């Protein structure tokens, strides 16, 4: 799935080898800001040790649980085939089907125009339904057809392998939405953006879910893991254990991640939300807030987390861009703070990271940066006070 600051490339540039080395001595692996879960999956598929995946957002927990909480492949395609057939029946019988047909007929086979997008928004706003995405995102991130497909798939989620099915749908939606970068705002129907909306709206959600479920089904963990939807600080203080290897990849944006992934969070929660603004955001109180994504509190949050870690017999691996980021943090700052409490080994790697959807004129969507990998160990002769 698309995810801001994914460690997929960094795993191939030294992080993976480092984790292999450190996991030999660790009792568990704890991924404190798991995001898309790529690091949790990397460890879970290679070591006979428990992986704990922690994140503030529910969609992250669902994605991680689909992989790390299962120790066998899902054989055959009966589950996903039965689910999609049930969703298609629901789609065919829903009253919104006629609205989708009305919109499709008005567009025809011609290329998409601004009036087509505005008509889609009008239709999805006018006809209130009990679906999760129809009124909130139809005509914006999703076409009317796609919004109805998502709602039908949510309504018909099977009880067996429900988490894996929901994870497949979240993954598909992340690759379907008509938005630059990471769904902070949908494309507006301008002349330049219309081709991107048209391309996104042509994607079939049913086909995408089938593809993504099969990808999830063939992967699993060696040992059944655990997911925690909650705050990293609270987990460290209350659930971290001596002997854990802790992976820390905190937010680097001064904008809350819940603003970029609210569409995925809505799908994960499977509940209707009232949205507003160009980004179609839920209310502020409904979006998880992290002190690490607030420029005024990020440094304090890092310091507090490091102090809590220093009270446990653990090894921590921290990754962060070397340069100053919009939340006021940098790899250098984190390293300097960590050296007050730990012996720190520093590794530098060139990597690219998302700028949250660049426009290629002011900035590219992805930029090269130097990423620091910091290994934190307790200082020799240090007395750990719990």
What are these regions (language model features)?
Residues 1-28, 38-45, 63:
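S-adenosyl-L-methionine
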Residues 6, 35, 251-253:
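Conserved glycine-rich SAM-binding loop
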Residues 27, 244-245, 314:
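Conserved acidic residues
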Residues 27-92, 96, 137-139, 147-155, ...:
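SAM cofactor-binding core of SAM-dependent methyltransferases
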Residues 253-312:
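SAM-dependent methyltransferase catalytic-core segment centered on the flexible catalytic loop
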Residues 289-347:
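Conserved Class I SAM-dependent methyltransferase catalytic core
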Residues 331-335, 342-386:
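Class I S-adenosyl-L-methionine
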């Amino acid at each position: 799935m698309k995810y801001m600051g994914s460690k997929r490339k960094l795993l191939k540039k030294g992080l993976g080898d480092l984790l292999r080395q450190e996991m030999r001595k660790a009792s568990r692996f704890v991924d404190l800001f798991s995001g898309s879960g790529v690091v949790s999956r990397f460890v879970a598929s290679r070591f006979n040790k428990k992986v704990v995946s922690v994140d503030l957002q529910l969609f992250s927990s669902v994605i991680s649980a689909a992989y790390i909480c299962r120790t066998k492949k899902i054989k055959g395609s009966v589950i996903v085939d039965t689910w999609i057939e049930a969703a298609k029946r629901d789609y065919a019988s829903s009253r919104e089907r006629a609205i989708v047909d009305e919109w499709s007929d008005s567009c025809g086979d011609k290329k998409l125009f601004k009036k087509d997008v505005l008509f889609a928004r009008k239709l999805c706003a006018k006809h209130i339904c009990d679906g999760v995405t129809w009124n909130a995102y139809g005509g914006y991130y999703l076409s009317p057809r796609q919004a109805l497909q998502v709602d039908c798939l949510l309504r018909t989620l099977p009880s067996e392998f429900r988490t894996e099915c929901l994870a497949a749908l979240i993954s598909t939606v992340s690759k379907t939405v008509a938005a630059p970068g990471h769904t902070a705002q949908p494309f507006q129907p301008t002349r330049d953006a219309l081709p991107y909306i048209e391309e996104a709206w042509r994607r079939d959600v049913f086909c995408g879910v089938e593809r993504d479920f099969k990808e999830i089904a063939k992967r699993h963990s060696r040992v059944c893991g655990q997911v925690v939807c909650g705050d990293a600080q609270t987990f460290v203080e209350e659930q971290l254990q001596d002997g854990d290897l802790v992976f820390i990849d905190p937010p680097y944006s001064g904008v809350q991640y819940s603003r970029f992934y609210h569409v995925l969070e809505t799908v994960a929660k499977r509940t209707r939300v009232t949205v507003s603004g160009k980004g179609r955001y839920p209310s502020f109180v409904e979006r998880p807030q992290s002190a690490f994504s607030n420029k005024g509190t990020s440094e304090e949050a890092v310091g507090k987390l490091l102090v809590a870690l220093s009270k446990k017999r653990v090894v921590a691996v921290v990754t962060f861009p070397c340069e100053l980021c919009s939340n006021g943090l940098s790899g250098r700052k984190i390293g300097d703070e960590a050296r007050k409490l730990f012996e720190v080994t520093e590794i530098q790697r060139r990597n690219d990271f998302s700028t949250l959807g660049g426009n290629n004129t002011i900035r590219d969507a992805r930029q090269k940066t130097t990423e620091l990998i910091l290994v934190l160990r307790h200082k020799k002769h240090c007395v750990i006070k719990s």
